[in-house]
Amino acid sequence: MLQAIGWPWPGPPADSAWQAMCAMYSQCRPARVIEQHRSGYVVAEAPEVPIKVESLPAWQRRSFPPHERAVVGDWVLLDGRRIVALLPRRTVIKRLAAGEHYRQQLIAANLDTAFIVCGLDGDFNPRRIERYCVLIASGGVEPVVVLTKVDLCVDVAAAVAVLREHSSQALAVVAVDARKAEPVVALYPWLLPGRTVALLGSSGAGKSTLTNTLLGEQRMKVGEVRQRDSRGRHTTTHRALLPLPSGACLIDTPGMRELKFTGEEDLVEEFADIELLATQCRFRDCAHQAEPGCAVRAAIGCGTLDPQRLHHYFKLRGEIVGAADRSMLRRY
């Protein structure tokens, strides 16, 4: 029954690190974290069979690093109703938590795909989607853009074209009416049995509506959206893993207002075109400003690279370097 909640193998784990952990705790059994609350965790060993469990004592200490605690999507080992170990993560999406101090916040773990849900209304922001893609791809997860509220957009094809201009990778973009089952069929290639998908996006983007459609029932509360800024209230208040009729698992998440980098990200996937051009520069330490033999500047000069794309590349790279510096200072 573990396969029905995303266990990645047909039998015992094939990963050597997982094998070692399971052998070390041979009397324990694996389970998946399906809900995370301030008071503790809810796990499952089979679909629709939630178990409220005690976490490791170390996790309850305020000084314990938050990113080392379990998060929705994690696999743990249980002894009765007590978590005794956290299995190594295959993938993870994380961001820098809001506030002055450096603190990582995990969004979800052990994902195959993340749907970036964006409404084709005032919520549509290609630069923010680009930022999502960097966070997601850096965690080893495949990003897929899901455009909702197609009834509010005069030219959906033009919106899709704009997104493709802002991405150098083969980014999948799917436009759907999240309220109807038929268009959502287009998402099924990412919802195969055993796969895990997370929904990310702003409040009011249509994540809960899409979740209800994929579930085939009205389980998630849907909120109204303010017309002046196309933002909604947080109808999803905590992360939860839900088995879908297709055999996949869906992680619904609260709306995300801030997307700060942790300093561990890279831009290789989202800005592959610029990274490739940089390898062709005359100088290895080229800053792509006014150096002779700069392939990046040459691409701008001949019109094959958008100057705004390079500007955003510099902006994101600066944020990542700044976050990495804050992380280093925190260690000393």
UniProtKB/Swiss-Prot annotation:
Subcellular location, principal: cytoplasm
Recorded GO MF terms: GTP binding; GTPase activity; metal ion binding; rRNA binding
EC number: 3.6.1.-
Binding site for GTP: T148, K149, V150, D151, G201, S202, S203, G204, A205, G206, K207, S208, T209
Residues reported to bind Zn(2+): C281, C286, H288, C294
Protein origin, superkingdom: Bacteria
InterPro entries, sorted: G_CP_dom, P-loop_NTPase, Ribosome_biogen_GTPase_RsgA, RsgA_GTPase_dom
Pfam families assigned: RsgA_GTPase
Subcellular location: Cytoplasm
GO cellular component: cytoplasm
GO biological process, one term: ribosomal small subunit biogenesis
Domain called CP-type G: residue spans: 103-259
Keywords associated with the record: Cytoplasm, GTP-binding, Hydrolase, Metal-binding, Nucleotide-binding, Ribosome biogenesis, RNA-binding, rRNA-binding, Zinc
Cofactor detail note: Binds 1 zinc ion per subunit.
Cofactor(s) this protein requires: Zn(2+)
Free-text function comment from the UniProt entry: One of several proteins that assist in the late maturation steps of the functional core of the 30S ribosomal subunit. Helps release RbfA from mature subunits. May play a role in the assembly of ribosomal proteins into the subunit. Circularly permuted GTPase that catalyzes slow GTP hydrolysis, GTPase activity is stimulated by the 30S ribosomal subunit.
Subunit structure, as described in the record: Monomer. Associates with 30S ribosomal subunit, binds 16S rRNA.
Family under the similarity heading: Belongs to the TRAFAC class YlqF/YawG GTPase family. RsgA subfamily.
Protein name: Small ribosomal subunit biogenesis GTPase RsgA
Organism of derivation: Xylella fastidiosa (strain M23)
Encoding gene per record: rsgA
